[in-house]
Amino acid sequence: YQDANGNALFSSDGSGNVQTQKLNYPSFRVRLSSNQSISHDTWTKIQFNTEDWDTNTAYDNSTNYRFTVPTGLGGKYLFCYTAVIGDLNDGKRGAVRLYLNGNAVNYGRENSYSSSTGANTYSNGQLMMDLSASDYVELYAYQNNGDSQTIYSTSIFTGMRIGS
């Protein structure tokens, strides 16, 4: 069956089994298997190494720690992310931002400031992007506490295709 513009909505395999279009594929959700240390005053890639799911094997959780758009699946994507940066001093900043093809994306960046010494900051955000096959997306974190700090394993990164 098709919509008014001829786009397939669902079909039958001829044996009575309905097959829907996988509009929200690929999708993934990744997290850290343990805490990660990040340096002071440096944007550092978060090395999400545990996959809760990865529908198209498009997230590399062992080498580059990034999502790559599979061939033929360019389109609109939604990414959601949270980084829990620990033990910052009062007024210090924790932040996250996406990188596209190795370059910082300057919109969708989330800054959080510690309200008391020793507090965790929760930097999170969502961003829709128009991507092409072979584009890749990574999540980076930043903190300015004066020494290395911890990104906790409760941090997550998710993404899914939401349309062509």
Region spans (language model):
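Mid-length scaffold segments of soluble, non-membrane domains
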Residues: 76-78
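A detector of low-complexity, intrinsically disordered, Ser/Thr/Gly/Pro/Ala-rich segments
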Residues: 18, 40, 53-55, 148, ...
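Terminal beta-strand-rich extracellular "head" domains
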Residues: 57-64, 70-71, 80-135, 140-156, ...
